[in-house]
């Protein structure tokens, strides 16, 4: 979890509100519980857990938006500038519902619901 604290610090340094799930809910909460909370509170899920993208596809959900890191190095020192750029560039998509996949070579944006 410590590297997530580094992400939260990076987001806050760029005036982006961020909170780790451990401050909100149970550590062992099911993914659908986290997704429901994020949808209801209009938060974007930032994760390296591929299950959130799968849940979006299976449920045809229109929210919440998910930013998914698909790379071995998930540290903000490696991806921070890319993620901050994505948050700024795709802000309107994230507000209306999107799955954004970040990796070392290319970033993909898919509008929700996924088909």
PLM-predicted stretches and their roles:
Residues 1-44:
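N-terminal first-folded block
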Residues 39-56:
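Acidic, metal-binding active-site segment of PIN/NYN-like and related structure-specific nucleases
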Residues 10-14, 33-35, 59-62, 82, ...:
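Short, glycine/charged-enriched secondary-structure capping and boundary segments
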Residues 25-33, 50, 74-78:
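Residues at secondary-structure transition points
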Residues 53-87:
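Mid-chain, well-packed structural core segment of small domains
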Residues 21-24, 69, 102-104:
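Conserved beta-strand termini and adjacent loop/short-helix elements that scaffold enzyme active sites
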Residues 89-115:
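Charged phosphate-binding loop/patch that engages nucleotide di/tri-phosphates or the phosphate backbone
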């Amino acid at each position: 979890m410590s590297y997530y604290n580094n992400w939260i610090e990076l987001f806050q340094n760029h005036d982006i509100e961020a909170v780790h799930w451990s401050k909100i809910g149970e550590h062992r909460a099911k993914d659908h519980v986290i997704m429901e909370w994020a949808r209801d509170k209009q938060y974007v899920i930032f994760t390296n857990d591929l299950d959130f993208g799968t849940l979006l596809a299976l449920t045809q959900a229109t929210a919440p938006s998910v930013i998914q890191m698909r790379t071995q190095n998930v540290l903000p020192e490696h991806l921070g500038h890319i993620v901050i750029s994505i948050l700024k560039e795709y802000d309107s998509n994230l507000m209306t519902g999107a799955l954004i996949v970040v990796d070392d070579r290319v970033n993909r944006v898919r509008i929700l619901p996924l088909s």
